[in-house]
Amino acid sequence: CSLMVPCPWRLHAVSLLQETPELSFGVHLTSVSEQPLYRWGPVTCADKVPSLVDEQGYFYSEERIDESLAKLELSELEREYRAQIDWVFATGLRPTHLD
């Protein structure tokens, strides 16, 4: 079981995980918005991770992954991934792994 923090239904997922504490889960570190019509952006403010987002403030789609990789700043990717992990810990949940 994995939790994708940038996705819109994360609060519902957290609620379900809190109701089933015996369930092991991981944080699925996310930096791509896979669906062209159902998009998500960073947990970090977009202006703090400009290399990760497109002109609309969303993560790049899979179709634009080459463009994303060409401008990627590893420090921004680390900032975003840490924010996703910290967000989960702030809910009181304790993930067992990252994926």
Task: Annotate each PLM feature.
Residues 38-68:
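Active-site gating loops and adjacent loop-to-helix segments of metal-dependent hydrolytic enzymes
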Residues 10-24, 42-54, 90:
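Acidic (Asp/Glu)-rich catalytic clusters
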Residues 2, 22-28, 95-99:
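Structural preference for beta-strand elements that scaffold enzyme active sites
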Residues 75-97:
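CE4/NodB-like, metal-dependent polysaccharide N-deacetylase domain
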Residues 66-78:
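Active-site mouth loops of central-metabolism enzymes
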Residues 8-11, 75:
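Generic alpha-helical secondary structure signal
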Residues 4-8, 28-34:
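Active-site beta-loop-alpha junctions enriched in small/polar residues
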